[in-house]
């Protein structure tokens, strides 16, 4: 599989320069221009970014996703995802470069994990081929590290330290203490489902389709919490871990007793409002515990679920009550994107780090360092 992917991509990106050595390390730059490639799941994205020690600026970005194709099949299909990445990457690269204009690129970064292994291999191979053909350095980037950067990058800044970060998405829910660019400690993670996965599965139980997190949020606005009873997972327990399997099971039993929940109407709206409140309270409780444990006064939130306004408002209220500075990934920066990958590559280029030509895809790559 990987040989076929590499061979296919080199036909698109360009040929290796005969007899010319590939750059192994970068000297420190005052200003650096990087390209980021993101293919950890079903989104295909490319971005061009300039950065220096004062901040960063997005020069060009192109993203494509086809959720309807996966939705029709009930979830993400790896083989379909690989084919989409192979088809879309060359076009998106051209589009991002055209938006950025003529710029000298110093480094390329591509997501190497965590994520779907076949999808990661496509982006990783594409990034290496692009970097080699242009004489750039190459960095394998941790997808979750990208999410740690996104709340700052969306404000035109590189990360400030120390901070506590909540990454909450369909595939990940964790709290991280970041004390430096390469100093990260996981404070808590989910013991089963991610919060975004819980939203999607509970939405499907309520007859809202899959993925249905956004539909559940919309339905919740028309309902009232407290009209039904669901548990608040892990609330008040020791540590900072999450768990959503108990909530999912309780919701299933509730729907079995009240089948009208799975049909349009007041019962469905009230159910969604209770689900929204349960997940909100769980996230707030765990984040508050992490801030108390570390004593850090800067808090960030990123990942696709942070686009949920109910979740975001609950976290904002918690931060305000605790007197904590909150940085949120804005707009498209909260979901998977290549800009955050380009930003991490820029940080490494500014630090003069060595290239990662031998890096392989790692579907379970931890963000802890």
Question: Residue locations for each model-derived region?
Answer:
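Conserved phosphate-binding catalytic cores of ATP/NTP-utilizing and phosphoryl-transfer enzymes
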Residues: 140-164, 344
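A contiguous, well-structured pocket-lining segment that forms one wall/lid of small-molecule binding clefts
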Residues: 61, 218-299, 308-322, 349, ...
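Low-acidity, Ser/Thr- and Arg-rich intrinsically disordered low-complexity segments
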Residues: 2-11, 16-18, 22
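Glycine-rich phosphate-binding/hydrolytic loop that grips phosphoryl groups
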Residues: 147-149, 329-367
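Conserved phosphate-binding/catalytic loops in two-lobed NTP-binding clefts
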Residues: 140-141, 316-341
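N-terminal beta-alpha supersecondary unit
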Residues: 32-114, 143, 147, 271
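Glycine-rich phosphate-binding loop plus the immediately following alpha-helix
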Residues: 179-222, 248, 253-256
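Short beta-strand scaffold segments in enzyme catalytic cores
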Residues: 44-50, 165, 173-177
